[in-house]
């Protein structure tokens, strides 16, 4: 019964994670449509400090869509492993890229289409090989996991690294090195996902009628989540303000997801009972998503489509045929000139002989 319940929860979490990606990916399109609508009306743009978007219903629809996506993502952690939910967040980028090509007339080149396909394949592989059962079901179990020596050492190291990056490395190299602010967001993000996971369990217990609000861990997790998310937003905005978005997005996804997977492996031990083939499959799916996200962002400004391939082949073929024709013409000209030369030389010899005979 417990095993069947675990699989049932897994598929609920999977559905919530995928619906979250659809809502969040669609929210960017709705917001963008609203902002473009305001720009056509001549209103002051948001980038110039304007707030006219607050009167645009499309922008509010995008905000509500994003809120629904975040709620679904939050709930997904209560049912499915973080190893599955976090990497599936890449699907929101994919949804946004596909919808923007249809509704915003933004071209999705061949590299982007291949990237989308790879992201879908990688996500499918991760769904197949991700752990199906969740070990932690109560806050008491969560508190025992948080007190595990392995996680205490990991958490201590993460806090030390984050503090060094924030107070020592950041002020010196944050403006020039893209990895500084992204690393801060990523290592702190590992804690935020763990807090979300714990709060999701607390909400499940609350609906079951248990006195969760009296448990100090629930409030500690809530406070930690607020601190972690505030720090993440602060340093992610700094990275986006200084560096190119097409570079920040894939690097942040890789660093953040790697931190979450590492934290989940240590705290929840989701990988402990996984067969070797499932571990390899999960990692393969993750790296496939990374390649897909890289192709989607790194070459998004390159004008290259499927129609470009046969054109280039035809150009090469024409060039080759042209070269062969030129060579043929040159050979013909050489033959003709050689023939004319021989005939002329023969004619001169004959006329000389005739002249000699006449003189004789």
UniProtKB/Swiss-Prot annotation:
Tissue distribution of the protein: Widely expressed.
PANTHER family assigned: MAGNESIUM TRANSPORTER NIPA2 (PTHR12570:SF1), PTHR12570
Protein source organism: Homo sapiens (Human)
Functional note: Acts as a selective Mg(2+) transporter.
InterPro entries reported in the protein's UniProt record: Mg_trans_NIPA (IPR008521)
Membrane topology: Multi-pass membrane protein
Coiled-coil region(s): none
Gene that encodes it: NIPA2
Single GO BP term: magnesium ion transport
Residues on Extracellular side: 1-9, 78, 129-149, 197-215, 268-278
UniProt name for this protein: Magnesium transporter NIPA2
């Amino acid at each position: 019964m417990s095993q069947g319940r675990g699989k049932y929860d897994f598929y609920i979490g999977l559905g919530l994670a995928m619906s979250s990606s659809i809502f969040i990916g669609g929210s960017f399109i709705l917001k963008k449509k609203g902002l473009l609508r305001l720009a056509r009306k001549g209103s002051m743009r948001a980038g110039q400090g304007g707030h006219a978007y607050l009167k645009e219903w499309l922008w509010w629809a995008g905000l509500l869509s994003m809120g629904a996506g975040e709620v679904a993502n939050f709930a997904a952690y209560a049912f499915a492993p973080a190893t599955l939910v976090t990497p599936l967040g890449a699907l929101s980028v994919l949804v946004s890229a596909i919808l923007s090509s249809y509704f915003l007339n933004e071209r999705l080149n061949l590299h982007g289409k291949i990237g989308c396909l790879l992201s879908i394949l990688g996500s499918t592989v991760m769904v197949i090989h991700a752990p199906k059962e969740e070990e932690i079901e109560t806050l008491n179990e969560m508190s025992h996991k948080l007190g595990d020596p392995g996680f205490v050492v990991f958490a201590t190291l993460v806090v030390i690294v984050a503090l060094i990056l924030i107070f020592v490395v950041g002020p010196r190299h944050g403006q020039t090195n893209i990895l500084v602010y992204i690393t801060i967001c990523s290592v702190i993000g590992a804690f935020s996902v763990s807090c979300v996971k714990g709060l999701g369990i607390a909400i499940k217990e609350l609906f079951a009628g248990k006195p969760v609000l009296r448990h100090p861990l629930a409030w500690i997790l809530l406070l930690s989540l607020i601190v972690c998310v505030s720090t993440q937003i602060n340093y992610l905005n700094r990275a986006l303000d200084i560096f190119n978005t097409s570079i920040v997005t894939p690097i942040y996804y890789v660093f953040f997801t790697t931190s979450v997977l590492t934290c989940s492996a240590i705290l929840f031990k989701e990988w402990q009972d996984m067969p070797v083939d499932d571990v390899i499959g999960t990692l393969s799916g993750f790296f496939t998503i990374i390649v897909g996200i890289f192709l989607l962002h790194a070459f998004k400004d390159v004008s290259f489509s499927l129609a470009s391939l046969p054109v280039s082949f035809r150009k090469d073929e024409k060039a080759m045929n042209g070269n062969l024709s030129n060579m043929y013409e040159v050979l013909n000209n050489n033959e003709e000139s050689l023939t004319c030369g021989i005939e002329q030389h023969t004619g001169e010899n004959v006329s000389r002989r005739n002249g000699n005979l006449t003189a004789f």
